[in-house]
Structures are given as C-alpha cells and as structure tokens.
C-alpha cells in the first residue's frame, strides 16, 4: 500500500473459526477486511462490500456426469485453465450403502429420492456454498424441489471438510458434500495409518484403497462464483480511494511469485475487481434454499 501512497502502521491478522464467524465479525465492524466464500458474502452483504473476486486454476475435469469423475483413471488434476467458478460434488463414501449408491451411478442409473433419503449425509453449515447451498440446489433441480432440509438423516458439521472426509473414511456416513475436487486435498492422508500425518499435517485416515476408487461422485452442481475479498461497511477506514488502492494492491501482490505462494492456501491464483451484482446468483441460491 505504501507504493500506492498509503502508510499502514500495523495490521492484525486473525484466522476465523468458521466462515460464519468471519462474516459476523465483519458485520459488527470488528474485522475490517476478510476472505469469504460467495455464499457467505451473499448472506452478510447488507453489512459487507465485495471488492475482489478470486480466480483459480481450473481442474482437468469439469464434467456434469458424475461417473466421469470416478476411479483412479479419472483422478482429477489441478491443471485446467483459469476459472472464476468452481463446483460442489456430492460423494458416496466407502460405507456399505455408499458403495451401493456409487455402483448405481457408475452403471449409468439415476438415483431416486428414496435412494438419497435412505443415506446418512454429512453437510457443512447452511451458509457454505459448496458444503450446503449448491448441493441443496442440486437436489431441488433433480428431485421436485426437495432439498437438504427434507432429508431424513443429516449430520451437520461445524469443523470443516476434513471432518467430513474423516467420517467418510470411518464409514460413519454414506454421503458427504465438498468443493471440487476435495479428494485432491485428502489424497495423501487417505491411505496413511491413523497415527501418522501427511506433509500438510492432516491426520492419516487408515484406508487401504485410493481415495479416487473409494470416494465416488454421485452428483455435480452448477458452477459457484469464486471467493471474495470483502470489506466491512462498519469500518472507519475506507474511502473510495483506499478501496481502489486495496484492489490494485492485492492484484499486484498475487501477480508475483511470492504473492502466489501466500494465496496458494486458498487456491487463489489471481484477483479481479468485483461488484455486489456479481453475487446476485449466490443471493438467489440462498433464498431458494431458505424457502
């Protein structure tokens, strides 16, 4: 920011316990700037303004046919073109019933509502785009308006996708939902002994076959607009000039090798200036799920 004419003495950086917690803190004005998924931004957009949208490296697979994602031969790679959206995937776990669901999908059979309702689902908080909102919209589009809240056996998870994959590995649930392709991030830990950790610190899950064979995609959602960099409307610091400088600053930083390394934790590879209207679709998704 100093190169753009603004001297900032001190920045306090914290890690939110959840996306909702970050959104609530920004709404209250106790956080000035934060990174929020599109769905969380839409939920808090009365009190928060978007300034940037992330771009990411796309995946090698963007098929809407779930069977195309399954098996070692279809293992997803992070080598696609730059994209402004991602998808959520609905995965059948290696539980006995999860395997039944996967076998039907891989044979080209469409799952019925009864098939899905019999399963035990693990889902994220209701503000999570990939972990709740878009999977619920997928159900609505394919099963006569039914959604996650209509399912008989749903296990909400407050502690993130790692917990969902650990439940899957333990065969405690039959279906989990996650961003595409979450299997990349848990591939190394999936087959490690449970008393070991992978190089990123993820605990081993003790499975004996690869995650690509055991975690089968049974549903693919519509595209989800990428994460935001957003600012609190309650903050005392922002003027249009400072916002413009922040936008340029983040775009410049991520354009460097050092910046790319910093933002790799989010899988962000670039930023583009954004407006609130870009997330009208995310608001519509929230409304559809809430009704």
State what each model feature region is.
Residues 142, 237-291:
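An extracytoplasmic/periplasmic, membrane-proximal ligand-sensing/linker region
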Residues 55-129:
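A conserved helix-loop-strand patch within extracytoplasmic ligand-binding domains
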Residues 6-7, 11-24, 37, 147-166:
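Short helix-initiation/N-cap motifs at beta->coil->alpha
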Residues 21, 25, 30, 39-43, ...:
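Extracytoplasmic/secreted proteins, especially bacterial periplasmic and envelope-associated proteins
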Residues 1, 11-15, 118-122:
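Short, well-ordered beta-strand elements
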Residues 1-10, 137, 249, 257-262:
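Short, polar/charged alpha-helical segment
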């Amino acid at each position: 920011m100093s190169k753009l004419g603004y001297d900032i003495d001190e920045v306090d950086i914290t890690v939110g316990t959840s996306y909702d917690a970050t959104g609530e803190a920004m709404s209250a004005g106790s956080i000035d700037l934060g990174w929020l998924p599109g769905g969380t931004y839409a939920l808090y957009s009365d009190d928060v303004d978007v300034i940037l949208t992330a771009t990411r490296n796309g995946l090698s697979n963007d098929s809407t046919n779930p069977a195309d994602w399954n098996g070692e031969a279809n293992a997803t790679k992070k080598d696609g073109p730059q994209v402004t959206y991602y998808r959520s995937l609905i995965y059948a776990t290696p539980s006995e019933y999860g395997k039944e669901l996967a076998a039907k999908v891989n044979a080209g059979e469409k799952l019925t509502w009864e098939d899905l309702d019999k399963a035990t689902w693990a889902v994220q908080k209701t503000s999570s785009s990939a972990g709740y909102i878009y999977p619920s919209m997928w159900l609505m589009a394919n099963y006569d308006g039914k959604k996650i809240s209509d399912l008989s056996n749903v296990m909400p998870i407050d502690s993130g996708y790692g917990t969902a994959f650990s439940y899957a590995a333990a065969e405690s649930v039959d279906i989990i939902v996650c961003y595409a392709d979450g299997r990349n991030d848990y591939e190394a830990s999936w087959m490690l002994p449970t008393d070991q950790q992978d190089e990123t610190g993820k605990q081993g899950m003790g499975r004996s076959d690869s995650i690509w064979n055991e975690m089968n995609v049974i549903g693919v959602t519509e595209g989800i607009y990428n994460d935001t960099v957003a600012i609190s409307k309650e903050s005392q610091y922002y003027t249009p000039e400072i916002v413009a400088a922040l936008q340029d600053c983040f775009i410049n930083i991520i354009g460097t090798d050092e910046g790319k390394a910093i933002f790799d934790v989010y899988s962000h590879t670039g930023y583009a200036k954004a407006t609130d209207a870009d997330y009208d679709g995310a608001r519509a998704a929230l409304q559809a799920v809430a009704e």
